[in-house]
């Protein structure tokens, strides 16, 4: 982490349980990020928190630290059964649930608290086997949690801590009824510690969330620009015919160490993947219909650096903790203004700098005014020379092979294609 991303406040300054501090310091976490420094004094005092902070600022460790401390500092409910978890952490996507579980594992190892994971798609029996042995902290998506609860594999009557992560996305995706169904099966709000975290929290979301919380304290860490000072933003106006060639030329010019390319549809993502894979790039594809095991493998390969480029729909835009992303390309301008913030928030994380490049084509340029109004500034426009765009491009591949790493490792220097002024 960059020192500019941290505060002078240390985890050891708080009255945290010693095992929690030990686990944090073992992982190299000594100083708090701003959202952690604001949240911990409240949660340690038993206050509910609704926290808004730009993505990549440490929200996950804020609620995990609070959760582990609370469970270690408060006895379980009397006569708690083996199928009754003590804490429930809800996430909008299975990828985010898996990531939270991975982040929680060092704390679980140090404290002896048991973790469980529940998400749809696959792994039903494997997840159930863990739950049947008893878990303290259950992390999951609402649909699978309800499934297990209806079959009495889990009972929420002993819940002491509840977390809603990426809460705005959960409401946007229509999970309000699911969330309320789960809350109705828990002890009352004043008998739990309740936390809600997200990068963006509209008044509507806060109002809905506070229905399930006990006089929550609202905390916010937000830069003057919603998009962050460390992210260089750039905008091009290509024609539809030149759009793909411009993207490939920009990739050759920028030669990003690790890039995510966002498009608005699965079909468009597959098209981009086909062009880049044919051109020898180590590229992975992440869309909603990719099998769960493959999705997790692709994310792991991208995180490890075995893939240089990830082409994704907005399923990957929220909550995933992928370090060291240097570039984000908006091949399509998103229809939702908040998705623009979340997309480019994949870069410039944890104090690092990043570069966001957006293509305002004939189809999606109409989305630009609303985006610029929402972020509070105009995106700087750059021009390109159509005659300098790449032309020696192979025929795109089709998805008849595994969707990861089809191109060889990049060993040569990038081709020199310069923009116009």
UniProtKB/Swiss-Prot annotation:
Keywords assigned: ATP-binding, Cytoplasm, Helicase, Hydrolase, Nucleotide-binding, RNA-binding
GO BP, one annotated term: RNA processing
Compositional bias of kind Low complexity: 402-414
Top-level EC class as recorded in UniProt: hydrolase
Span of the annotated motif DEAD box: 165-168
GO CC, alphabetical: bacterial degradosome; cytosol; membrane
Motif Q motif: chain residues: 9-37
Activity regulation note: ATPase activity is stimulated by interaction with RNase E.
Domain Helicase ATP-binding: start-end pairs: 40-219
Region (Disordered): 392-421
Keyword Hydrolase: yes
Annotated localization: Cytoplasm
CDD domains, sorted: DEADc (cd00268), SF2_C_DEAD (cd18787)
The EC number(s) this enzyme carries: 3.6.4.13
Domain (Helicase C-terminal) ranges: 245-390
GO molecular function, one term: ATP hydrolysis activity
ATP-binding as UniProt keyword: yes
InterPro entries noted in UniProt: DEAD/DEAH_box_helicase_dom, DEAD_box_RNA_helicase, Helicase_ATP-bd, Helicase_C-like, P-loop_NTPase, RNA-helicase_DEAD-box_CS, RNA_helicase_ATP-dep_RhlB, RNA_helicase_DEAD_Q_motif
Residues noted as binding ATP in the record, renumbered to the chain: 53-60
Subunit relationships: Component of the RNA degradosome, which is a multiprotein complex involved in RNA processing and mRNA degradation. Binds to RNase E (rne) and PNPase (pnp). Forms multimers.
NCBIfam families per the UniProt record, alphabetical: PRK04837.1 (NF003419)
Protein name as catalogued: ATP-dependent RNA helicase RhlB
Originating gene: rhlB
């Amino acid at each position: 982490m960059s020192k500019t991303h941290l505060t002078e406040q240390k985890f050891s300054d708080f009255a945290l349980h010693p095992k929690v501090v030990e686990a944090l310091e073992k992982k190299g976490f000594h100083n708090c990020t701003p959202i952690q420094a604001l949240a911990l004094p409240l949660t340690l005092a038993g206050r509910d928190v609704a926290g808004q902070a730009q993505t990549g600022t440490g929200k996950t460790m804020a609620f995990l630290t609070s959760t582990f401390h609370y469970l270690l500092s408060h006895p379980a409910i009397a006569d708690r059964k083996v199928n009754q978890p003590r804490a429930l952490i809800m996430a909008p996507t299975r990828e985010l649930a898996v990531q939270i579980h991975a982040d929680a594992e060092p704390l679980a190892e140090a404290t002896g608290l048991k973790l469980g994971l529940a998400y749809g798609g696959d792994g039903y029996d494997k997840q159930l086997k863990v739950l049947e042995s008893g878990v303290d902290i259950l992390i999951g998506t609402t649909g699978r949690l309800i499934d297990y609860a209806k079959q009495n594999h889990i009972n929420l009557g002993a819940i002491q801590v509840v977390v809603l992560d990426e809460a705005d996305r959960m409401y946007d995706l229509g999970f309000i009824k699911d969330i309320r169904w789960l809350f109705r099966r828990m002890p009352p709000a004043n008998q739990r510690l309740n936390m809600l975290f997200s990068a963006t929290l509209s008044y509507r979301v806060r109002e809905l969330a506070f229905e399930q919380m006990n006089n929550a304290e609202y905390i916010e860490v937000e830069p003057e620009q919603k998009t962050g000072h460390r992210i260089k933003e750039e905008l091009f106006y290509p024609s539809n015919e030149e759009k793909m060639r411009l993207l490939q030329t920009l990739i050759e010019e920028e030669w990003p160490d690790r890039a995510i390319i966002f498009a608005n549809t699965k079909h468009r993502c597959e098209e981009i993947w086909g062009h880049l894979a044919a051109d020898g790039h180590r590229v992975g594809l992440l869309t909603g219909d990719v099998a769960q095991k493959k999705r997790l493998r692709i994310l792991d390969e991208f995180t490890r650096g075995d893939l240089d480029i990830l082409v994704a729909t907005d399923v990957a835009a929220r909550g995933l903790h992928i370090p060291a992303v240097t570039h984000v390309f908006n091949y399509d301008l998103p229809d939702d203004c908040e998705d623009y913030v979340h997309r480019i928030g994949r870069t410039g994380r944890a104090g690092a700098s990043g570069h966001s490049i957006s293509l305002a084509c004939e189809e999606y340029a109409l989305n630009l005014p609303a985006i610029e109004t929402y972020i509070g500034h105009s995106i700087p426009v750059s021009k390109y020379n159509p005659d300098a765009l790449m032309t020696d491009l192979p025929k795109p591949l089709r998805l008849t092979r595994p969707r990861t790493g089809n191109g060889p490792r990049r060993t040569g220097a990038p081709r020199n294609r310069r923009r116009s002024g």
